[in-house]
């Protein structure tokens, strides 16, 4: 590995982390040598760089050194292709067959492309085989599976390119598909789109084009239950079921990422890929993209197409009153996270808080929210008639009950880097203080205090505008572009005729009743002209700039005639005589996505130890119950029947079910043929029938004695009520964890994941700068952690100084801190009572955890990242440096990851516990990255901008809707610092925030009870927000959520299975006896009438209340009839003679 390019302080930081890691591994190795773990040493290999990760993940020796050499002179993608060729041709690694070499080459190449982090190279490619063309030549078949999705479209597509690249090097022919195979691909992908989901759906002709011309056969394992109907039982396709991996690679890979594949094909001068030009040309840019190229930003409604009940719409696409775009980066935004004022969070009924995901109109698809109180909050009309802007969260809490209408929901802070990452044209910037300041500095040398510049009086703003030709200050620039000429003239006429302006107090008075009757009150609200209502009079303070913009003088007399223009911004500039610029030219629509998360990770159902107890533990899988279980009255107490792997000790020959024998020797599987029942030694197949041998069998286990001995081994009393095990093990050898670990976990109330580690999940939020006082520690503690100065170079002495966060430091929620404290106490108990070594953490409070090492790990990946805990936050999120998130191949658009204590991870993790199924190695720390190199993290992090203020050229360029790539040269980006010490340090930000955790602690989506309550809250908020069309929201929720649910549940009711409430066995139809044939328990329905009806009444009520379309109303009525016909008893009532005589029969 090349030397890390960093300052002396950063080198000391990395060295300290690695020294502590090394010490922890020594302690863990000593402990594991004494215990009953699968191996006596730590099973997570360390990796300092990408090359190490790839070698450890794929297991091809010598590949790391080659990658380091290639990386010096090639791009990442070129390096991946070249290392693939070298592996395939035998320059690296030793392989028995040509097929094995090709398979290893493709896996290694994909691992390089995905930074050696995701599991796709080992889980997403099941196998590679050589097939036969009809002319007798060979071709490559790559069998993809579901986990290939985690690689991303580009890596999926490039894996196919790698296959072509390496086949040429070793003389394998191209794939020549038969016509029926081409049509099978078309049918299969269309069907997959219906039963699963695709980000991009190519046309049938595009699918045919790809299959006919792709030189590698894109094959796959069956992943869905659905089968094709037309092109079945094909000779060279081994299944009639849908191959999900194939569909993903062809549609989201080659079809969607064709331009990127073409770029690499051109670089490498590869022939046979000319058909990509047809594919790229066929995917015409239309609609939105064409309009944006013509300097028009067209509204996009994609983000509200699939609305979910209970998750509100905050703004319809680009609608006035919605989020106003503001460019910039706070210390807790960027990398797909955006900032809003915490007052906005409060006044949107607490649906948004830190970490809440919003589905947004642009620049990307989604963004996690962060609190930034230096930008503008919402403007609201109170029941009193006042129009006020609320920037302070305390005021928001005080006034929230008085809000009648949210006229404008405030600003949303999005950084330039997110537009660059998404390659989205820059939207026109509003005229904000940052831009105005450039104009002021260029025109005026007069020194004015900073506070006055930010919040000037009307006199100062007008003086600067008139004397120095500086555009009118944003404070007094209203949203003139939101009204039309008719409204402008009506407002002007009304102010002339009915207004009363006092020069002394600068208040414009307007009669309230007349304002309402003439629509002037509404026009003032559209303009965001703040005002109070007192004694039936509207009072507008500091009104002179407003009056002048109407073309009036201080006596409310017209100074100039109305210009001949429909652009009201230009009109105000003409009438006033000074420059006026647009205040909010760009709006961004948004709705709620996922709520924020900060919670412990549990398996479903939860477990505290990977020890099987079958049905003996009941529905709760309780080991305590299993220890007292008896099959019958006369049965042996604690004897249970479970499926386990039989093992034997090579030293003493004893048969056991554990990794280690009582004599101290490590055991090995005792293999036998499942058909012949004969023992198999030193062979991979049965010598009699050729079947693969196994060690797994149903055994009768004296669990009570194992249970009692485990308590004795750790010195605990049998006073526990609940210790949660598992019904059945999922690992290949079916060998359990030591039971002692489960006892200690239950004592400390912690739960494990599939690999034996204790984890805590949190939504990802970026953080580049932090203050001691907002993360629950002191400046002194920060100094202990190696922070010596603030961002301005001053010595770190006060708790409120801002420091630049080090790349592997994390801040977790207080709740997470409490869970990590329990985990630390469990680990110490484990070290002392089970392993017999000294405790490691000695933690009594969460403050004792500050400075401990953690492992960060993202779902669908296989590489953990070493981190250090430096503090806690009230917010339900995990704050970390963008590079830390990027090193896990995550961004901050609403993703969530987990952390685990380092000692817990290295002590308890084992590959032997991972499920033996496709995807089993995902979400497991198969390798640990010890040092983050910015060059090797996900490239999205390279687009983060770092200046303290954006240049003036940037604001001007946005008015021309330029492509963000045109401005890379003038912006201070991470990419421009790579390879220098500045890649880690001296980052800045444009907008500060007083508290990163400001705002509600939890989204009301999580705190509200039933779905009906959430839906009512969603519609109540929609009625309150000016930028939202409530009837449209109601219709969309019915069509995309409630009606599909009602239909699905109705269908499920008719197809349901039966379930035993005692043992959980399921049956396609009820047993004739009505009792479970396995255990005698009651058999019940799995889908009940209540589940089918649950959304029916609310759907009917909402349909009427909001006047949804007649089509939707009729769908609801038809469903109502279907449900009634299924559940209501329409049998004819038996009538007696008396009923006829009394006439009641009529």
UniProtKB/Swiss-Prot annotation:
NADP in keyword set: no
Highest taxon above the source species: Archaea
Swiss-Prot/TrEMBL catalytic activity: DNA(n) + a 2'-deoxyribonucleoside 5'-triphosphate = DNA(n+1) + diphosphate; Exonucleolytic cleavage in the 3'- to 5'-direction to yield nucleoside 5'-phosphates
GO molecular function: DNA binding; DNA-directed DNA polymerase activity; single-stranded DNA 3'-5' DNA exonuclease activity
Keyword Cytoplasm belongs to the record: no
Keywords of this entry: DNA replication, DNA-binding, DNA-directed DNA polymerase, Exonuclease, Hydrolase, Multifunctional enzyme, Nuclease, Nucleotidyltransferase, Transferase
GO biological process, one term: DNA-templated DNA replication
EC numbers on record: 2.7.7.7, 3.1.11.1
Its job: Possesses two activities: a DNA synthesis (polymerase) and an exonucleolytic activity that degrades single-stranded DNA in the 3'- to 5'-direction. Has a template-primer preference which is characteristic of a replicative DNA polymerase.
HAMAP family cross-referenced by the UniProt entry: DNApol_II_L_arch
Family classification: Belongs to the archaeal DNA polymerase II family.
SUBUNIT field: Heterodimer of a large subunit and a small subunit.
Protein's name in the database: DNA polymerase II large subunit
Organism: Methanosarcina barkeri (strain Fusaro / DSM 804)
Gene assigned in the entry: polC
């Amino acid at each position: 590995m090349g030397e890390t390019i960093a300052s002396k302080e950063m080198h000391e930081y990395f060295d300290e982390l690695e020294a502590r890691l090394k010490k922890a591994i020594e302690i863990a190795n000593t402990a594991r040598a004494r215990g009953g773990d699968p191996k006596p040493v730590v099973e997570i290999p360390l990796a300092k760089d990408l090359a190490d990760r790839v070698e450890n993940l794929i297991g091809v020796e010598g590949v790391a050194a080659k990658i380091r050499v290639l990386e010096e002179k090639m791009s990442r993608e070129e390096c991946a292709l070249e290392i693939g060729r070298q592996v395939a041709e035998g320059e690296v690694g030793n392989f028995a067959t040509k097929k094995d070499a090709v398979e290893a080459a493709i896996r290694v190449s994909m691992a390089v492309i995905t930074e050696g982090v995701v599991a796709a190279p080992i889980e997403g490619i099941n196998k590679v085989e050589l097939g036969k063309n009809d002319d007798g030549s060979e071709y490559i078949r790559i069998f993809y599976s579901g986990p290939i999705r985690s690689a991303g479209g580009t890596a999926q597509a490039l894996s196919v390119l790698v296959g072509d690249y390496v086949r040429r090097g070793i003389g394998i022919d191209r794939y020549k598909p038969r016509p029926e195979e081409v049509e099978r691909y078309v049918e299969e992908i269309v069907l997959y789109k219906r039963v699963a989901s695709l980000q991009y759906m190519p046309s049938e002709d595009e699918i045919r084009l790809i299959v006919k011309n792709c030189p590698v056969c894109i094959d796959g394992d069956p992943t869905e239950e659905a089968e094709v109907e037309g092109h079945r039982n094909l000779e060279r396709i081994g299944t009639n079921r849908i191959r999900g991996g194939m569909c993903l690679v062809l549609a989201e890979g080659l079809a969607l990422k064709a331009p990127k594949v073409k770029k690499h094909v051109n670089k490498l001068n590869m022939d046979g890929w000319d058909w990509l030009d047809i594919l790229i040309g066929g995917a015409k840019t239309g609609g939105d993209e064409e309009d944006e190229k013509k300097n028009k930003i067209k509204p996009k409604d994609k983000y509200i197409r699939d609305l979910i009940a209970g998750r509100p719409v905050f703004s319809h696409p680009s609608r006035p009153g919605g989020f106003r775009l503001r460019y910039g980066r706070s210390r807790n935004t960027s990398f797909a996270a955006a900032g809003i004022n915490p007052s906005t969070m409060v006044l949107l009924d607490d649906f948004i808080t830190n970490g809440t995901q919003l589905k947004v109109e642009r620049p990307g698809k989604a963004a996690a929210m962060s609190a930034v109180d230096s930008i503008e909050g919402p403007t609201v009309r109170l029941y009193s008639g006042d129009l006020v802007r609320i920037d302070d969260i305390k005021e928001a809490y005080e006034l929230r009950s008085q809000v009648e209408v949210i006229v404008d929901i405030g600003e949303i802070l999005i950084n330039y880097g997110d537009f660059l990452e998404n390659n989205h044209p820059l939207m026109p910037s509003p005229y904000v203080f940052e831009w105005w300041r450039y104009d002021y500095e260029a025109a005026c040398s007069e020194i004015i205090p900073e506070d006055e510049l930010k919040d000037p009086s009307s006199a100062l703003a007008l003086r600067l505008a008139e004397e120095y030709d500086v555009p009118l200050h944003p404070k007094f620039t209203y949203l003139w572009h939101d009204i039309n000429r008719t409204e402008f003239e009506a407002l002007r006429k009304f102010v002339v005729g009915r207004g009363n302006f006092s020069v002394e107090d600068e208040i414009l008075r307007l009669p309230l009743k007349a304002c309402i009757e003439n629509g002037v009150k509404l026009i003032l609200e559209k303009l965001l002209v703040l005002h109070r209502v007192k004694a039936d009079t509207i009072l507008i303070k500091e009104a002179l700039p407003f009056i002048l913009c109407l073309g009036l003088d201080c006596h409310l007399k017209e100074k100039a005639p109305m210009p001949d223009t429909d652009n009201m911004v230009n009109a105000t500039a003409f009438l006033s005589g000074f420059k006026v610029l647009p205040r909010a030219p760009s709006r961004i629509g948004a709705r709620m996505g996922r709520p924020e998360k900060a919670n412990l990770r549990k398996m479903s159902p939860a477990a505290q130890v990977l020890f099987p107890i079958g049905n003996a533990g009941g529905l709760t899988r309780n080991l305590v119950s299993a220890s007292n279980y008896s099959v019958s009255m006369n049965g042996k107490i604690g004897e249970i029947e479970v499926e386990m792997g039989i093992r034997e000790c090579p030293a003493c020959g004893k048969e056991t079910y554990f990794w280690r024998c009582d004599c101290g020797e490590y055991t090995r599987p005792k293999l036998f043929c499942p058909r012949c029942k004969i023992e198999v030694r030193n062979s991979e197949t049965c010598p009699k029938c050729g079947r693969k041998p196994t060690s797994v069998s149903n055994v009768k286990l004296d669990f009570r004695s194992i249970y009692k001995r485990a308590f004795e081994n750790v010195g605990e009393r049998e006073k526990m009520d609940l210790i949660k095990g598992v019904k059945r093990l999922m690992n290949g050898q079916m060998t359990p964890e030591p039971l002692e670990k489960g006892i200690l976990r239950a004592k400390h109330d912690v739960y494990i994941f599939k690999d034996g580690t204790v984890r805590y999940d949190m939504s990802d939020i970026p953080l580049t700068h932090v203050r001691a006082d907002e993360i629950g520690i002191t400046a002194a503690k920060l100094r202990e952690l190696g922070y010596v100065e603030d961002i301005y170079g001053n010595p770190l002495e006060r708790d409120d100084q801002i420091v630049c966060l080090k790349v592997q430091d994390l801040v977790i929620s207080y709740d997470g801190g409490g869970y990590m404290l329990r985990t630390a106490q469990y680990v110490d108990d484990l070290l002392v009572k089970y392993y017999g070594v000294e405790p490691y953490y000695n933690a009594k409070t969460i403050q004792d955890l500050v400075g401990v090492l953690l492992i960060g790990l993202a779902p669908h990946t296989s590489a953990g990242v070493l981190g250090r805990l430096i503090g806690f936050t009230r917010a339900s999120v995990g704050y970390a440096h963008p590079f830390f998130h990027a090193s896990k191949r995550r961004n901050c658009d609403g993703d969530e990851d987990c952390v685990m204590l380092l000692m817990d991870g290295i002590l308890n993790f084992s590959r032997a516990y991972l499920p033996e199924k496709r995807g089993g190695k995902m979400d497991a720390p198969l390798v640990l990255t010890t040092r983050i190199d910015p060059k090797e993290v996900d490239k999205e992090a390279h687009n983060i901008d770092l200046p303290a203020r954006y240049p003036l050229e940037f604001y001007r360029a946005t008015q021309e809707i330029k492509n963000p790539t045109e401005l890379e040269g003038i912006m201070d980006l991470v990419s421009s610092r790579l390879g220098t010490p500045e890649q880690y340090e001296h980052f800045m930000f444009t907008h500060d925030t007083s508290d990163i955790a400001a705002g509600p602690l939890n989204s009301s989506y999580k705190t509200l009870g039933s779905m009906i309550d959430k839906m009512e809250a969603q519609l109540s908020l929609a009625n309150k927000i000016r930028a939202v069309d409530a009837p449209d929201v109601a219709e969309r929720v019915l069509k995309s959520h409630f009606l599909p649910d009602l239909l699905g549940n109705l269908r499920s009711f008719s197809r349901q299975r039966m379930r035993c409430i005692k043992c959980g066995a399921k049956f396609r139809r009820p047993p004739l006896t009505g009792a479970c044939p396995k255990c005698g328990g009651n058999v019940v329905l799995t889908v009940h009438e209540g589940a089918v009806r649950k959304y029916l009444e609310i759907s009917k009520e909402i349909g009427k209340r909001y006047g949804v379309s007649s089509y939707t109303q009729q769908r609801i009525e038809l469903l109502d009839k279907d449900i009634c016909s299924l559940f209501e008893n329409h049998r004819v009532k038996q009538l007696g003679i008396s009923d006829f005589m009394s006439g009641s029969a009529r």
